[in-house]
Amino acid sequence: QTIAKLNPDVKVNTYDTRLDASNIMDIIAGYDVIVDGADNFPSRYLLNDASVKLGIPVVHGSIFRFEGMVSVFHPLRGPTYRDMVPEPPPAELAPSCAEAGVLGVLPGIVGSIQALETLKILLDLGDSLIGRILSVDTTEMSFRVFKLRADPSNVVTHENRDRIEVRDLDGLCAPWLSH
């Protein structure tokens, strides 16, 4: 309601459901860009596989304690999440935000950068973070940019989109391709 008051031309769709393999394709189909703030690896891989299949860019943001990261995964123009993280780390190395703690302002910093990257994609402005990772370290108040290249062993690509089976993922988050 607040957004409609600010700009009546903006349509907001809400989904009161958990994103899973049974609904993800219907929910994300037709969007120009997806903003990802998922806090777990199975959801990130599920979103990656669906967005790769549909050719939709994803503005990814993640946080951990005092650090954050933002990247744009564009299946038609650059690397994807599976290129950056082919396999999830062991559970003991990836505690939840509740277990590890997160600096309270960090989601706002990362979210603001994601909003900027989303606008850059939608308006075709500037140089987006496709093929790059922006790392934020709030303990040093430093920002670093790293290059990200496609992993030649990654089989979840837009070229293979007809073989990608979007499924709920187990703890291994292994890709599902039909033969």
Can you annotate each of these PLM segments?
Residues 1-179:
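Adenine nucleotide-associated cytosolic modules
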